[in-house]
């Protein structure tokens, strides 16, 4: 945790041995490992960290760690931001970050979507673990998954690494997506 979140301190709430840890690729799914419940002393966000068994690009398998801190923090900040049009996206079961989901049917215009996404991005980037260029952000991104009446359209990155994301860049990206997918918003 110190490697990925160097500006924070954590405490172990509980730990347990688990059988059949999460695995990926052709790796065996009958390995055992450990799961810990952790709390951040800085954000008071509670999350889990656990062993997983992953396939490498070389056909070998290895133990790794999975934590859902960024996702748990995003869930808290979505609730604090208090806009029901934004929700957590949990489509990727082994993700080292959190993503958000919006549906275009909940908005009146592309400008409104862009403004809400940009304001939320500004809000969560002012909080731990998203302040500054944290090491974990360089390995992952925070994406907004955009839907149109429950049909997936595409996703856009809200992460500032490796480029700066502005209100204008979000607006341009959403406009292009909607033109490409022939999506119009209600008047």
Question: Which positions does each model-derived feature cover?
Answer:
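A short, surface-exposed beta-strand/turn
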Residues: 45-69
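Metal-dependent nuclease catalytic core centered on acidic motifs
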Residues: 60-186
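A mature extracytoplasmic/lumenal domain signature
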Residues: 16, 42, 51-53, 92, ...
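Short, non-transmembrane alpha-helical segments in secretory-pathway proteins
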Residues: 1-16, 73-78
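Intrinsically disordered, low-complexity segments enriched in small/polar residues
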Residues: 13, 23, 31, 55-57, ...
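Exposed beta-strand-loop-beta-strand "reactive/processing" segments of non-cytosolic proteins
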Residues: 8-51
């Amino acid at each position: 945790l110190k490697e990925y979140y160097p500006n924070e301190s954590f405490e172990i709430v509980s730990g347990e041995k688990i059988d059949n840890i999460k695995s990926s690729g052709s790796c065996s799914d009958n390995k055992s490992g450990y799961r810990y419940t952790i709390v951040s002393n800085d954000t008071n966000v509670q999350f889990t960290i656990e062993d997983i068994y992953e396939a490498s690009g070389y056909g070998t398998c290895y133990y790794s760690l999975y934590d859902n801190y960024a996702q748990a923090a995003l869930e808290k900040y979505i609730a604090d931001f208090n806009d029901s049009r934004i929700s957590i996206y949990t489509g990727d079961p082994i993700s080292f970050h959190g993503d958000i989901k919006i549906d275009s049917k909940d908005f009146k215009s592309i400008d409104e979507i862009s403004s809400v996404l940009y304001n939320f991005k500004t809000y969560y980037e002012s909080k731990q673990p998203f302040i500054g260029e944290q090491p974990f952000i360089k390995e992952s991104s925070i994406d907004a998954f955009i839907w149109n009446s429950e049909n997936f359209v595409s996703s856009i990155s809200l992460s500032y690494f490796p480029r700066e994301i502005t209100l204008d860049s979000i607006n341009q990206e959403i406009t292009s997506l909607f033109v490409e997918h022939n999506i119009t918003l209600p008047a």
